[in-house]
Amino acid sequence: MGRIIRVTGPLVVADGMKGAKMYEVVRVGEIGLIGEIIRLEGDKAVIQVYEETAGIRPGEPVEGTGSSLSVELGPGLLTAMYDGIQRPLEVLRQLSGDFIARGLTAPALPRDKKWHFTPKVKVGDKVVGGDVLGVVPETSIIEHKILVPPWVEGEIVEIAEEGDYTVEEVIAKVKKPDGTIEELKMYHRWPVRVKRPYKQKLPPEVPLITGQRTIDTFFSQAKGGTAAIPGPFGSGKTVTQHQLAKWSDAQVVVYIGCGERGNEMTDVLEEFPKLKDPKTGKPLMERTVLIANTSNMPVAAREASIYTGITIAEYFRDQGYDVALMADSTSRWAEALREISGRLEEMPGEEGYPAYLASKIAEFYERAGRVITLGSDERVGSVSVIGAVSPPGGDFSEPVVQNTLRVVKVFWALDADLARRRHFPAINWLRSYSLYIDAIQDWWHKNVDPEWRKMRDTAMALLQKEAELQEIVRIVGPDALPDREKAILIVTRMLREDYLQQDAFDEVDTYCPPKKQVTMMRVILNFYEKTMQAVDRGVPVDEIAKLPVREKIGRMKFEPDVEKVRALIDETNQQFEELFKKYGA
């Protein structure tokens, strides 16, 4: 038990804290605000408080809880909405109304709800950390596997029969090698700053299919990969992340709204229950965990929300699921680090950010990955992290963007000009990159199309050629270009408008399956080959531009039937044959 001696914003200094540990959770003041010790000097402790500290004064008590900041992991996580320190917002609303009272806590998982438990082990079985004790159908999409906590191993001496239990009831007893008995419930706690263990890390060879053509074809994200979406305000970071949360082929989505506007979380809450998962036909909310830590919530909790989210994601990974984690936005978290570092009077680094910004960002992204999980069976799970970065004024040379680019392998650079032109997703194809292309091309060749890489590279080269030609057009106008280059501009316009641009509000075009993506690409590249042949045979470029098939190619993105899209190849060939006859080529 200590006493407060100083309060500066979210930081509180207390003395008489002998015996306290780093990162221990404490209750601050008479109201009992939740805080975490971030520095110890002698018997003084510096505490960052996760709630508003107005009204707290020196002399009030500080009480240690003996545990570090931990999350509860068990059935009840999915469809829930938490704040940055895993307090269920729905429950807090029932306790204190629309405005959250300070010092309030509620258990993260519902204590009175009964879950139907089916055991998967029997008495006498040997178990190790990560083994599946039983399963609970948490939602109609996700079967929640109840795991043996990583620190437990031994022999099952008692296991609950199939039936309905609450998370507080003991469902198994394990006799450890030293003879002690460990009682296991459906949930366990895990400190958020410690990454959950696994057996082995696997290379990221499987793409995370998002249904967004720009991303899947040109700048692919791998399962277990890391990606950053930097962009100025209004360029579509949040909308892009919502699209990925909706349609990516991860089985579980953890969405962290970290320091962004509250109405963006409201959008998720309103849209996701109405939207259907394309694979199961069930509401998307049933596979989603939301962590809302909006811009008007206390600054210190932003850091906690990032760690809370990734720990929950690792827990579902350990069950053998592919998890996608969206962090929107990591810049706000970095700003919180800057504010707390300033109040700690630490030496500032670049632009006032703390010198350890790079290592903090790296520490977060390193928890992504595709792994073989703990346990006797060889389960494979993954956590793919997609972090939005909001640099002030869209300046990509800013420290948060630069330090993020050092650790992530995929960079989707959003462009305000494209966003203004209503080009969605506004990912600039000349500035973005993905370092996973070589690793995942085998998957595409085996499962979708053996020519995927060749087509992708051809299209990319065309788009880069277009950028060079645009420079010339700006100076001397399009009429000065030779026919061959005019023809390239026709094809690249088709690539931009009919392939890269996507309609997030159209039922068909919001999600484009891999087979359709490859077929659309083939249609456009076939048009390109025929165009080049026509130009070489002396057909005027204006005639090519007027071909009726061009309009059909422009509409193919709204066509759900892949065979009808494929039929455009024959139609293109036929119309070019007629042109060749007309011009005697």
From Swiss-Prot:
Has multiple subunits with at least A(3), B(3), C, D, E, F, H, I and proteolipid K(x). GO terms for cellular component: plasma membrane; proton-transporting two-sector ATPase complex, catalytic domain. Its main location: membrane. PANTHER family: H(+)-TRANSPORTING TWO-SECTOR ATPASE, V-TYPE PROTON ATPASE CATALYTIC SUBUNIT A. Pfam families: ATP-synt_ab, ATP-synt_ab_N, ATP-synt_ab_Xtn, ATP-synt_VA_C. It is found in: Cell membrane. Gene3D superfamilies: 2.40.30.20, 2.40.50.100, Bovine Mitochondrial F1-atpase, Atp Synthase Beta Chain, Chain D, domain 3 (1.10.1140.10), P-loop containing nucleotide triphosphate hydrolases (3.40.50.300). This is A-type ATP synthase subunit A. It is a peripheral membrane protein. GO terms for molecular function: ATP binding; ATP hydrolysis activity; proton-transporting ATP synthase activity, rotational mechanism; proton-transporting ATPase activity, rotational mechanism. PROSITE patterns: ATPASE_ALPHA_BETA.
